[in-house]
Amino acid sequence: GFCGETLSDHEDTLSVMRAVGYDYAYMFQYSERPGTLAALKYPDDIPAEEKTRRLNEIIALQNELSLESNRRDVGKTFKVLVEGPSRRDPADSCGRASNNKMCVFPAAVPEKGLSDCKAGDYVNVKVLSCTSATLICERV
């Protein structure tokens, strides 16, 4: 919903997203910021409800694209930089692979001789499943 964006412009954005197939994206609703060129030169002429509708459409499409991308990683092995404990389960750790995708995996696997990992460690993981935002992994 940038100033002056038409429905055709918005559809073009969705079309580019489909064509490129981004793994992930940072998506925000436009809001005027004092002192910027846009605030000085362009009237904020897109209604808030329309900005929200367009953003929700972009987010829904990106969630589909991210899930497709993450599904292609199932079965692959990655070296992951551990960031710390998972927010959902303290027995799990989370970190990012070299492709910047978030991975969640057991912090320790005693039966495999894999000790507890901590932030800053590198661990090898294999992707078992995924969501649109996360690769669910096992330590290898």
Language-model region placement:
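Conserved C-terminal portion of the radical SAM core fold
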Residues: 1-36, 57-65
